[in-house]
């Protein structure tokens, strides 16, 4: 080998090897300090690309798992609201069963309907206000896609349905709808109700005021109607007097009258304090004189005491034919009503509905005025019409009664088959709740699968990019030894040109 000083080949060779060991040492230290086998693309270009794709998948699937948990939360929120709607529907059904019982009064039905209305309004409130992260989940039909994968199209769809009173088929649900108005309803529900009932007795027609019961003729200029005191017939003359029937007319009866004999016989057969009836009057034996029938009896008529005295029956008489009767007051019987009076003249009385019925009067239609509007009622008073249309009584939420025609009543009538309507609504709610329960289970399965996939991808990525510490420590030790050896050898290689000086001495 030539002896030269310009180029130290041994030194250059040693430096090159030292640089290689330095690079190996740096790489080993970098991997050991980072824990990664691939710290840059130069370490393993293909491996870095593969590991990066794994990282994308891992991050995407991890977020997808969180998305699936959000999906469960949405389903739980919606299902919780539906549970409360279900509770309200159950109460509405319970109230509807109560309302169908025939023992309920109008006020009972109104109270039941008031609570039903509040429950239905609460259903609408829950529907309109239930939301998840600002998204209303029951106010409209909606399909919410939940991303449960790392790539496009990997979604699970939650079907959200609009659930409110209308969508449940309970819009206008009513157990206390309007009912056909009757004359009694008008009189009890409204103020300033006037009118009359019409009656016909033979060729004559009459009106009866619905409030006072006064009877007048059904004419352009109606006259007041009276009952004739003599024969009980209807008349428009109030001045005619009629003679009453004698009961005890004279204060001094002649001997042997039927009255005297009857009362004398009662005294003879009784004792003081006994009572007996005669001509519909109850008498008391006040005084009994002997055993022949002489004595006094008394009674009270129209609040006044009347005393009858029986006398002139001889002692030991075999009968009472000779008895005389004296009355403290003249007493008569009315030919009209059979009541007792002390006057032998009775005046015609104002006719009443009972007098019309006694004269076989037949009731016709009625004319009723309510708040200035005139209505017609049929003969029985159970059907009110206006312009040919049947009228109905409707009560507002505040309990105020109003009259509406049959067209308006049809829109507010009681719900037909209310229990079937509620059962249908409950079935719809149950179907939506079942769907939400199933979707929650599906999300649970998706989350489990995503967790397994992320675990496996992490393992695969680790095998590609993570550093093997056993290998890297060996590489580092080797590089350190080579560095030490190379440094020592380089020092000796740098001394080789010194040998040329020995030739120059």
Swiss-Prot record:
It is found in: Secreted; Bacterial flagellum. Keywords: Bacterial flagellum, Secreted. It comes from the Bacteria. SUPFAM superfamilies: Phase 1 flagellin (SSF64518). Pfam families: Flagellin_C (PF00700), Flagellin_N (PF00669), FliC-like_3rd (PF22370). GO terms for molecular function: structural molecule activity. One of its GO terms (cellular component) is bacterial-type flagellum. InterPro entries: Flagellin, Flagellin_C, Flagellin_C_sub2, Flagellin_N. Flagellin is the subunit protein which polymerizes to form the filaments of bacterial flagella. PANTHER family: FLAGELLIN (PTHR42792:SF2). Belongs to the bacterial flagellin family. Individual Salmonella serotypes usually alternate between the production of 2 antigenic forms of flagella, termed phase 1 and phase 2, each specified by separate structural genes. This is Flagellin. It comes from Salmonella rostock. The gene is fliC.
């Amino acid at each position: 080998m030539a002896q030269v000083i310009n180029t130290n080949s041994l030194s250059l060779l040693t430096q090159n090897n030292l640089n290689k060991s330095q690079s190996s040492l740096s790489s080993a230290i970098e991997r050991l300090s980072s824990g990664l086998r691939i710290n840059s693309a130069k370490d393993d270009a293909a491996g870095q690309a593969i590991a990066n794709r794994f990282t994308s998948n891992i991050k995407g699937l991890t977020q997808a798992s969180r998305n699936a948990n959000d999906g469960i939360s949405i389903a739980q929120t919606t299902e919780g609201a539906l549970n409360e709607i279900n509770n309200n529907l159950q109460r509405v059904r319970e109230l509807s069963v109560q309302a169908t019982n025939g023992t309920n009064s109008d006020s009972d039905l109104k109270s039941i309907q008031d609570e039903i209305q509040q429950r239905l309004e609460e259903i609408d409130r829950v529907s309109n206000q239930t939301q998840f992260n600002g998204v209303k989940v029951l106010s409209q039909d909606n399909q919410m896609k939940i991303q449960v994968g790392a790539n496009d199209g990997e979604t699970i769809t939650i079907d959200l349905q609009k659930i409110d009173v209308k969508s449940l088929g309970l819009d206008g649900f009513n157990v206390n709808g309007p009912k056909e108005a009757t004359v009694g309803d008008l009189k009890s529900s409204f103020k300033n109700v006037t009118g009359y009932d019409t009656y016909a007795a033979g060729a004559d027609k009459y009106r009866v005021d619905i409030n006072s019961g006064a009877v007048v003729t059904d004419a352009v200029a109606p006259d007041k109607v009276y009952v004739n005191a003599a024969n009980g017939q209807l008349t428009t003359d109030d001045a005619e007097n009629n003679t009453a029937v004698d009961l005890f007319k004279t204060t001094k009866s002649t001997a042997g009258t039927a009255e005297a004999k009857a009362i004398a016989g009662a005294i003879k057969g009784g004792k003081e304090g006994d009572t007996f009836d005669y001509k519909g009057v109850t008498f008391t034996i006040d005084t009994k004189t002997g055993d022949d029938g002489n004595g006094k009896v008394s009674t009270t008529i129209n609040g006044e005491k009347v005393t009858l005295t029986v006398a002139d029956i001889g002692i030991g008489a075999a009968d009472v034919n000779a008895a005389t009767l004296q009355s403290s007051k003249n007493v008569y019987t009315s030919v009209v009503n059979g009541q007792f009076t002390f006057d032998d003249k009775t005046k015609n009385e104002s006719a009443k509905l009972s007098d019309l019925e006694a004269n076989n009067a037949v009731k016709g239609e009625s004319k009723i005025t309510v708040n200035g509007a005139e209505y017609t009622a049929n003969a029985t008073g159970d059907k009110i019409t206006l312009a040919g249309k049947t009228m109905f009584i409707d009560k507002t939420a505040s309990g105020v009664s109003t009259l509406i025609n049959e067209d308006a009543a049809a829109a507010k009538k009681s719900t037909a088959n209310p229990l079937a309507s509620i059962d249908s609504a409950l079935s719809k709610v149950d179907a939506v709740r079942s769907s939400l329960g199933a979707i929650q289970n599906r999300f649970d399965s998706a989350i489990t699968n995503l967790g397994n996939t992320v675990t496996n991808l992490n393992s695969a990525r680790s095998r590609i990019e993570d550093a093997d510490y056993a290998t890297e420590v060996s590489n580092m030790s080797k590089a350190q030894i080579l560095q030490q050896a190379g440094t020592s050898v380089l020092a000796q290689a740098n001394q080789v040109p010194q040998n040329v000086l020995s030739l120059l001495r």
